[in-house]
Amino acid sequence: MRTVLVVIFLLFYALISLPMFLVGFILGKIDPHKKPRFSQPFVIWGFRMILRISGVKLTVKGKENILRGQSALYVFNHRSYFDILAGYVTAPVPTAFVSKKEIGKLPMISRWMKYMNCLFLDRDDMKQGMRTILQGIELLKDGTSIYIAPEGTRNSGEELLPFHEASFKLADKSKRPVIPVALNNTDEVFEKHLPWIHSAHIIIEYCEPIYMDQMERAEKKHIGETVRAILAEKVAENAKES
């Protein structure tokens, strides 16, 4: 039943998105900064509705570590499409996600993502990947936070996959803090029950900021391992509360 209700809501959301796209387009012509600030609250509302219909109980820990008025690189462990929903409904405005290029081909979703300055990464094209990193650095400098999963893909295993160190260039070059974000049980909603949606208790924890500009060069070299260890510890701790 939850699955049917989510599908019905998505159809409704797609319908009302049409005039909202036009509003966002016009605002973007007036001021490019207004487009993401208009779009993200509408997307957050949609995500909140999906979480509610899905029967998700969302526990947010470490709210004091969510930076308001300053951009940051939010680094999360990736287990499910619902990571994005849990992330966006708790993230500051404006925030953009780094996603694989295939998502950019989905009609309605890709339009909203582009309106929010989300980045599409082609993992098979190094030049395009570098351009994406440079775009992300400029977004961070301009005040837009970025959510990224350094594992590079969804992980269904017990242990976190190795982190791609290049992801952290976004924070290093923009001189913005890294905030590890630990997610638990997001795959309990959908991926573990395909094609059905089940209720679940999602825990998202924002960890203390890490300032790379205060680190030694040797520490920066292994920042991915450091953040991975922090997230692995938090995921293990929060698993006991699930």
Predicted regions and their residues:
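Short gly/ser/thr-rich secondary-structure transition/capping motifs
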Residues: 53-61, 129-130, 186-188
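Thr-Gly-centered strand-to-loop micro-motif
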Residues: 61, 98-100, 122-123, 150, ...
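Catalytic core of membrane glycerolipid acyltransferases/transacylases, capturing the structured
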Residues: 21-44, 52-54, 68-126
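Generic preference for hydrophobic
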Residues: 60, 74, 97, 204-206
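Membrane-interfacial terminal anchoring regions of lipid-handling membrane enzymes
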Residues: 1-29, 41, 64-67, 221-242
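Active-site phosphate/pyrophosphate- and oxyanion-stabilizing loops and adjacent acidic/basic residues
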Residues: 48, 85, 168-169
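Non-catalytic C-terminal accessory region of glycerolipid acyltransferases
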Residues: 130-242
